[in-house]
Each structure stands twice: as C-alpha cells, then as structure tokens.
C-alpha cells in the first residue's frame, strides 16, 4: 500500500501523520522534544462517568513555566481527502458533510475528546482548554467556514481549534510571557 492510500483510509496512520506535522511545527518554533514538548506521554485523569482514575495518552503536552498545554492532533483526514480530490460538486458536498460529522464526532461523540478529561490531568498545571490541532490551514478554514457553529460549541466545551499558524502564534505568546517572567525575576534579584 502506498502512503497516500494509508493517509486516506487508515485512521492510525492519519493520527501518526498529524502528530508528525505537529512535532515538526513545534521543532520549527525552536521547542525541544522531551524538554518543551512531550509526545504521547501517559497521564492520569479522573473519569467522572466511571467515578475512578484512568490513564490517558494526550497527543502532545507543551510545557511552559506557568502552564502546560494539551494538544490533540487526531483530526480525521478520510473524508477531507475525498472532498479535496472530488470533481463532482454533489459528491464533494457530501464528503464535506461527512468530514464535518467526523470532526464533531471526534470532539463531542461518545468516545470523543469531551470524554477524555484531559483538562483534569493530575500533577499538571494545564489550561482548562485543550488545543485541537488541524494539520493544514485550508482544512481548518474550510471546516470552520462550512460549520458556522463548530467554533462556538468547541469553545463552550473548552476546545481551542487551531491551524498551524494559530498554534505558532500561541507559542510565540507563551514564549514572550516566559521571557518577560524571566526578566522580572532577574530585576528582582
């Protein structure tokens, strides 16, 4: 099987592909693996539905002095790739509709991110919101343009939807906060 077929049909491969894009993006922002970010690091959270602790493996943990940030990179590409390659307009609309349903299921479905309780991880001062990474800017913008309520519903559920550019901008802000904090500490010494 070639890589394109895997990318368009195999959800596990898609997840690894998305995660690789995310890791490359973080590295390009001068973050260092296993110091500034930690891929697939097992954490413990509280499962309110089962009333017990459970282990989870977030795609990425970004570590900054004041806060840590959880990033999910598992947006499905199956229907998206069909959508961008389809010539027939009627079929193209259906693939986009299927893609939107897939994104919503990933966020809000019975086994979706909303059930993972990433914002309740033990021992990690993480933001209440989870950053949901879309690995391509056009994937992000077309998804939000086609589903006008997705962004609002995501924010209500403590998800920050992010394109690669958005994530780089957030990292820049986090880095500036870290730098300013260091300057203040140096001045007060």
Predicted regions: what they are:
Residues 2-189:
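Amphipathic, heptad-repeat alpha-helical coiled-coil/stalk segments that mediate oligomerization
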